[in-house]
Design a protein with these regions (language model features):
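Positively charged n-region of N-terminal signal peptides that target proteins for export
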Residues: 1-4, 392-393
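Boundary at the C-terminal end of the N-terminal hydrophobic targeting segment
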Residues: 19-23
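N-terminal signal peptide c-region/cleavage motif recognized by signal peptidases
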Residues: 14-18
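Second-shell loop/turn segments in exported
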Residues: 52-53, 117-125, 143-152
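Sec-dependent N-terminal signal peptides
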Residues: 4-13
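Activation targets extended, charge/polar-rich intrinsically disordered C-terminal tails
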Residues: 140-393
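Short, Gly/Pro- and small/polar-rich lid/capping loops
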Residues: 25-43
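Glycine-rich catalytic cores of cysteine/serine-nucleophile enzymes that process amide/ester linkages
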Residues: 39-116
Length: 393
């Protein structure tokens, strides 16, 4: 009886196994059993790191995470520039290059963990074909290396995530919320709005960026900051399917960072303005010379950026009008031009303040106060003002 049962079992197995073998999937191109059409073959996520205290990290960082469990691959594709830490001169000259780098996710997260910055993951709902196209596109950019000039607005971490995903989608388009499509803003305004926690970075940024960054941008072109990208993609969809698949997952726990110094650009500007007002009555020459020296140093830097630097968005800057070396060059003849020059500076302050009140950011209030202080220093050099003050005494 046992032999009969064993025989029947063997016959059953012999008939079942070929059936399984026939039904097993074999890839027609690669000849393996991995189904590359499966929706989970490749998964794509957006990784966003919290802002850091360093001036080059105050906006945070965004990159794309690509995973392929079948081949045990898990990489972050991060668009970055060459290190700025020890190359400030090259940065100001516009000589730094940018490129796409593939970094293992563990190494990427460990770097931010050491800095105390949080990292969040947002899984993307992309078509399977687009996910594989995206990986191919990213690999091609990695192979090119760091060959493109540094340009935060056109090749920053956030905007390149948008560009790569759009290229992978081909003819399919991301449908953005109407609030983004209807908003009018410049790249400079968008960036400065995210500098509230780091006032000194925002203060310096206004000196560095102008020109093209002060032109209105629309739609996805406004997504030049990681925080803006996340908010836009939360409301975006592809063919009616939400672009972000789920709530964010915390990969690295961090501590919120900000500049908590009590000495802010606004405080500095008020102190200098009060000093300029007081010096109208004190009439101390060393105050005039100190202000002239500071104005000349900043003006020379502005002239260098606009005339000689290849740094992006430095073709023109409205701060060049009050900050330039011309007053120092013609200081000996100041009695002839002091009054009209001071009037022009005050007109500049009025125009910039009006822009701010209307919501169009070109400079900050601290810059306006500094220019107002400088205009008072120059105004005091006018013979007409000197005569008026001497009569009052």
């Amino acid at each position: 009886m046992h032999k009969i049962l064993l025989f029947l079992f063997a016959v059953l197995i012999a008939n079942i196994l070929p059936t399984f073998a026939e039904e097993q999937y074999v890839d027609p191109v690669f000849g393996d059993t991995i189904d590359r059409t499966d929706e989970d073959f490749v998964t794509v996520s957006l990784l966003v790191a919290d802002p850091g205290a360093a001036s080059y990290s105050v906006f945070g960082h965004a990159c794309l995470r690509m995973q392929c469990p079948a081949f045990d691959m898990d990489y972050c594709f991060s668009y970055e520039s060459e290190s700025v830490k020890n190359r400030i001169g090259d940065y100001l000259a516009g000589n730094l290059k940018m490129g796409l780098f593939a970094v293992p996710v563990k190494d990427y997260c460990d770097g931010y963990r050491e800095e105390g910055r949080g990292v969040y993951e947002y899984k993307l709902n992309l078509p399977s074909e687009a996910e594989q196209n995206l990986w191919r596109i990213l690999d091609e950019h990695v192979a090119k290396g760091s060959i493109l000039p540094y340009d935060y607005f056109k090749r920053g971490c956030a905007i390149t995530c948008v560009q790569f995903v759009e290229e992978a989608l081909g003819d399919t388009r991301i449908q953005y919320d109407a609030s983004l499509l209807q908003r009018e803003a410049t790249s400079k305004e968008i960036v400065l709005n995210h500098c509230n926690r780091f006032p000194w970075s925002g203060f310096a940024f206004a000196f560095l960026a102008a020109g093209e960054s002060e032109q209105l941008v629309s739609g996805a072109e406004q997504l030049c900051v990681p925080a803006e990208l996340v908010q836009a993609w939360k409301k975006a969809s592809i063919n009616g399917v939400p672009l972000l698949a789920q709530e964010p997952v915390l990969l690295v726990e961090g501590v919120p960072q900000w500049d908590d110094s009590w000495f802010t650009p606004m405080l500095l500007a008020w102190l200098i303005l009060c000093l300029a007002i007081a010096n109208i009555f004190w009439n101390k020459p060393y105050c005039d010379w100190l202000m002239l020296l500071a104005q000349t140093v900043v003006g020379a830097a502005m002239m260098y950026l606009i005339c000689f630097s290849n740094l992006c968005c430095t073709s023109w800057n409205w701060l060049l009008i009050p900050f330039n070396p011309l007053p120092a060059i013609f200081w000996y003849w100041r009695k002839y031009w002091a009054l009209p020059y001071a009037c022009v500076m005050m007109g500049w302050c009025l125009a910039m303040a009006t822009n701010l009140l209307w919501g169009h950011v070109m400079v900050g209030w601290s810059h306006i106060l500094l220019v107002l202080a400088w205009s008072l220093i120059v105004l005091k050099q006018s013979p007409w003002v000197c005569t008026l003050l001497s009569h009052k005494k």
